[in-house]
């Protein structure tokens, strides 16, 4: 079991501990539960889906990286496929506050980058901030997404974001988590190709500035993040954050990164290079390359 889970695991009910122990035994537990695993946990504990998600939140929050606030938030995004995806907030010392990742963004990106097609619900241990409510409104499930909070009845996003402004107001038809392929040819080595593939999945209807980041760890594992724009602009999630979300949730740490590649267009209206390289250097990665989409 990864050390970060030990304290939270010890506080779980005995029957949930017993059912989870073989799942968490792998140090690189992928921070997700398949539909089959969810069904097995429900049977072992007698909990329904909502109660089980609440019971698992401490494990999601244990994935938080909060050296600045020490305020750990956990989220579990429930995919329409039946898979549940953990998420947690992340802060980066030496970077800027704008680089921060919120738990809801983490869980949603985890699902999206794992190939999930849409979300049915998200469970969070604290009320989503306005930034996250706006981020969720970009999803293809948008205002119908169910939000579950401890001690409250579940409500749809539309109840938390009345009179919402979103992509439909800008006549955007393709939404976050819809399948997209921008068709750029995969060239270069495996890491460069992973970055280009991530850029091809970008959701960037506002700036038309595709980008993707791929991180290679010392053991050869590659984590890729795609750019995710938002109708309100500021809640946009950069591609580096997507890759760092996966790196963290899958049990790796920043010192494990040995090389990074950013893929973007040289003449794009928005450029990721400066922010990407500055944040990576703050995390200790100095081997950073850029490949140009053509």
Curated annotation (Swiss-Prot):
Keywords: Hydrolase, Metal-binding, Zinc. The lineage of its organism: Bacteria, Pseudomonadati, Pseudomonadota, Gammaproteobacteria, Enterobacterales. It comes from the Bacteria. Belongs to the cytidine and deoxycytidylate deaminase family. Pfam families: dCMP_cyt_deam_1 (PF00383), dCMP_cyt_deam_2 (PF08211). It comes from Escherichia coli (strain ATCC 8739 / DSM 1576 / NBRC 3972 / NCIMB 8545 / WDCM 00012 / Crooks). Substrate binds at residues 89-91. Residues 48-168, 186-294 form the CMP/dCMP-type deaminase domain. This is Cytidine deaminase. Its cofactor is Zn(2+). The active site is at 104 (proton donor). PROSITE patterns: CYT_DCMP_DEAMINASES_1, CYT_DCMP_DEAMINASES_2. It is an enzyme of class 3 (hydrolase). Zn(2+) binds at residues 102, 129, 132. GO terms for biological process: cytidine deamination. GO terms for cellular component: cytosol. SUPFAM superfamilies: Cytidine deaminase-like. Its EC number is 3.5.4.5.
């Amino acid at each position: 079991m990864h050390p970060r889970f030990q304290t939270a695991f010890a506080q779980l009910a005995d029957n949930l501990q017993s059912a989870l122990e073989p799942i968490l035994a792998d140090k690189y537990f992928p921070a997700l539960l398949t539909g089959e695993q969810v069904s097995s946990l429900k049977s072992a504990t007698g909990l329904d889906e909502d109660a089980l998600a609440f019971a698992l939140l401490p494990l999601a929050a244990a994935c938080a990286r909060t050296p600045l606030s020490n305020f750990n938030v956990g989220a579990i995004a429930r995919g329409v496929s039946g898979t549940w995806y953990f998420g947690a907030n992340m802060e980066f010392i030496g970077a800027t506050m704008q680089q921060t990742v919120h738990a809801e963004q983490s869980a949603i990106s985890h699902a999206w980058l794992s190939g999930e097609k849409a979300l049915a619900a998200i469970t969070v241990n604290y009320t989503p901030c306005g930034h996250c409510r706006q981020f969720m409104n970009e999803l293809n499930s948008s205002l119908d997404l169910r939000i579950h909070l401890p001690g409250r009845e579940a409500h749809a996003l539309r109840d938390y974001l009345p009179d919402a402004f979103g992509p439909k107001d800008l006549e955007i038809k393709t939404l976050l988590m819809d399948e997209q392929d921008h068709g750029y040819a995969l060239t270069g080595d495996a890491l460069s190709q992973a970055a280009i593939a991530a850029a091809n999945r970008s959701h960037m209807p506002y700036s038309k500035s595709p980008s993707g980041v791929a991180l290679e760890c010392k053991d050869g594992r590659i984590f890729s993040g795609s750019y995710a724009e938002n109708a309100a602009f500021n809640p946009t999630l950069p591609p580096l954050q997507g890759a760092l979300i996966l790196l963290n949730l899958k049990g790796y740490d920043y010192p494990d990164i040995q090389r990074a590649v950013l893929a973007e267009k040289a003449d794009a209206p928005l450029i990721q290079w400066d922010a990407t390289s500055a944040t990576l250097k703050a995390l200790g990665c100095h081997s950073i390359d850029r490949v140009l989409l053509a």
